[in-house]
Amino acid sequence: MLGQKCLNLKKVRKNGLKFSIGTDGLSSNISLNLWDELRANLLAHSKIELNKLAKMLLIAATKDGANALNLDAGEIKVGKIADIGVFDSLEVKNPSELAIQLILHTKKAQITFIGGQI
């Protein structure tokens, strides 16, 4: 949110644009936790179906975030940088709800791999 307005994600998608999401400092937010940022965005964009929005936000925080920073990362793929977080297991009964459950219930990684190293 900036000036009490949110980015119009429907318009962004309609125009074929990509967006990324991250944290930028405590001067403009109350937390540097990316999961808090994702949760805030999940609540701020009420005009988009929650599961669809959750998937969009995870892509914005991973693949599209890496692309915005010109990093060869952001997805699990041969040749990409192996930056991976391992999180507590979730009891997700419906696999289509995995993205929303991750955003709602994740606090921090249990293990992180940067460049393939713990």
Predicted regions span which residues?
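Helical hairpin unit composed of two closely spaced alpha helices linked by a short loop
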Residues: L2-G3
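His/Asp/Glu-enriched, well-ordered alpha-helical/loop segment
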Residues: L7-S89
